[in-house]
Amino acid sequence: MSKILFFMCVIGCFMPATLMAKVEKVTLKGVIKGLGNEELILMNTDQSEIVRTKTKNDRFKITAEVETGDLRYYMLYAPSVGPLGPSMSIPAIYFFIDSPEITIGAELKNERINIKSLKGSPGRQEYDRIMASLPSASRVEEIYDNYNKAFHEYNEVSQTPENMKKLKAASQAVDALQQQRREEIFGLLPQYTNSMPFAVIISSYFGIDNIDEAEKVWKQFDPSIRYCYALKQLEDLIQRGKSCAVGHEAPDFELMTPAGEKIKLSSLRGKYVLVDF
């Protein structure tokens, strides 16, 4: 344990302070066309609230103290437009706060907020550059537009066999595109082992079902950027995956019973327990 702590200390000493996560006062400002005079909430990705404001004629300005430097996502959410739950239309946008001032240009349309421009974020600029460099980039908009149109025609207009056929074809095109983009992104890994924006991109492809692959990718990133939020989350995923492997002791967790009481898995030690996921 002492060797691990010493190694972490050495890494920390040689990292420029400006590159590490820290609490910093920042300003977010901009325009969300079509929002009018509504409440806007700055949130963490776990949906915990940071600060609220109210737009005035589509315009907003927020000053807050947040963690910066590790390229974590933040979210702006307009609660009056719709919920954050699973939906094709969510009135929220995600972005990095990696400089003291971020300027956002966005538009509210069909209960969705779409970013049109974002200034002041080097991380977002590099993220967009990498994604635009993919051979498949020129086809993304067309394929997703076709899918959204087919989805609308079948679910909102008429559930005919012809519309179902179009929806299936559009869905298959999306699946093929996603597979191609995955292969292109993984092929770029050797070039971007020091890139936090690339770490954000590639880490989105991992879940609890491909832990071994996730660990191989995580190990290829330079230790100097492993404080990156995406890589820390990936590391946590790997550790949780290993602890849940067959033959390992199940991690302790707490659930609410139908009677409103809290119960821990560890309190049932020595008993047969069925855990239904």
Positions of predicted regions on the chain:
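Short active-site neighborhood of thiol/selenol oxidoreductases, capturing the structured segment around
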Residues: 264-277
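Conserved hydrophobic/aromatic pocket- or pore-lining residues that grip, position, or stack substrates
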Residues: 201, 253, 275
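N-terminal targeting signals for export/organelle localization
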Residues: 87-90, 103, 176-245
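A non-transmembrane, solvent-exposed segment enriched in polar/low-complexity residues
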Residues: 20-172
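Bacterial Sec-dependent N-terminal signal peptides
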Residues: 1-30
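A glycine-biased structural micro-motif
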Residues: 37, 247-248, 270
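N-terminal "domain-start" segment that seeds a small globular fold
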Residues: 232-266
